[in-house]
Amino acid sequence: HYLKPQPETLADPETFAFCVRVTLYAVAFGIKEVGEHDPEVRPIVLNLPDGTVEMRIEQGPAAHLTIKGGSFYPQRGPAENPNAILEFADLQTAWDTFQGNIDTFSAVGSGRIKLRGFIPLIEGVNPLMDRLAYYLSD
């Protein structure tokens, strides 16, 4: 219901913010499951550097994912010392990204999505996000 809400559900700003927050957390925790159990992405995971990626929405919620030896440790909230940060300018940008309704390359170019820190860590997590989207699609 909240991961794939109807448009009228998203019309309420508080419900929209809740849906984005729930989806952000689902992405962080879903990456763990995909990364540790999907044989398609396991080779990528085994070559990921150790570190912490923080996913956050400017002036909004955050989640982070620590990667160590091919295992994932997701948590809600900001990371103490992230190695890389994936930051969305606002709730709408985050939502559009999670729903696959945004050209991420142009969003990075326009500053709606900001990448900071050890970018190869974010690049390594990106295929896991894509694979998670595959599992969550209709």
Give the role of each language-model region:
Residues 1-138:
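Feature captures hydrophobic
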